[in-house]
């Protein structure tokens, strides 16, 4: 059962995670957000219950 041999698969997994962690992730984190964060408190909207015609 060659799929149980971790030699090639472990290397591929390790290289892909290193590529993601060292190259792709810092580039993604450097982007600015399109909507800046605000300190406003979120308002909760109250909804009235639906009046069902058959009750």
Swiss-Prot record:
<keyword id="KW-0138">CF(0)</keyword>
<protein>
    <recommendedName>
        <fullName>ATP synthase F(0) complex subunit 8</fullName>
    </recommendedName>
</protein>
<keyword id="KW-1133">Transmembrane helix</keyword>
<dbReference type="InterPro" id="IPR001421">
    <property type="entry name" value="ATP8_metazoa"/>
</dbReference>
<feature type="transmembrane region" description="Helical">
    <location>
        <begin position="7"/>
        <end position="29"/>
    </location>
</feature>
<dbReference type="GO" id="GO:0015078">
    <property type="term" value="F:proton transmembrane transporter activity"/>
</dbReference>
<keyword id="KW-0812">Transmembrane</keyword>
<dbReference type="GO" id="GO:0045259">
    <property type="term" value="C:proton-transporting ATP synthase complex"/>
</dbReference>
<keyword id="KW-0813">Transport</keyword>
<dbReference type="InterPro" id="IPR050635">
    <property type="entry name" value="ATPase_protein_8"/>
</dbReference>
<keyword id="KW-0066">ATP synthesis</keyword>
<keyword id="KW-0496">Mitochondrion</keyword>
<dbReference type="GO" id="GO:0015986">
    <property type="term" value="P:proton motive force-driven ATP synthesis"/>
</dbReference>
<keyword id="KW-0406">Ion transport</keyword>
<dbReference type="Pfam" id="PF00895">
    <property type="entry name" value="ATP-synt_8"/>
</dbReference>
<keyword id="KW-0472">Membrane</keyword>
<comment type="subunit">
    <text>Component of the ATP synthase complex composed at least of ATP5F1A/subunit alpha, ATP5F1B/subunit beta, ATP5MC1/subunit c (homooctomer), MT-ATP6/subunit a, MT-ATP8/subunit 8, ATP5ME/subunit e, ATP5MF/subunit f, ATP5MG/subunit g, ATP5MK/subunit k, ATP5MJ/subunit j, ATP5F1C/subunit gamma, ATP5F1D/subunit delta, ATP5F1E/subunit epsilon, ATP5PF/subunit F6, ATP5PB/subunit b, ATP5PD/subunit d, ATP5PO/subunit OSCP.</text>
</comment>
<dbReference type="GO" id="GO:0031966">
    <property type="term" value="C:mitochondrial membrane"/>
</dbReference>
<comment type="function">
    <text>Subunit 8, of the mitochondrial membrane ATP synthase complex (F(1)F(0) ATP synthase or Complex V) that produces ATP from ADP in the presence of a proton gradient across the membrane which is generated by electron transport complexes of the respiratory chain. ATP synthase complex consist of a soluble F(1) head domain - the catalytic core - and a membrane F(1) domain - the membrane proton channel. These two domains are linked by a central stalk rotating inside the F(1) region and a stationary peripheral stalk.</text>
</comment>
<keyword id="KW-0375">Hydrogen ion transport</keyword>
<comment type="similarity">
    <text>Belongs to the ATPase protein 8 family.</text>
</comment>
């Amino acid at each position: 059962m060659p799929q149980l041999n971790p030699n090639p698969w472990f290397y591929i997994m390790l290289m892909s995670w290193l590529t993601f962690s060292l190259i792709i992730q810092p580039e993604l984190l450097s982007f600015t957000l399109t909507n800046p964060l605000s300190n406003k408190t979120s308002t909760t909207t109250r909804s009235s219950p639906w009046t069902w015609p058959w009750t």
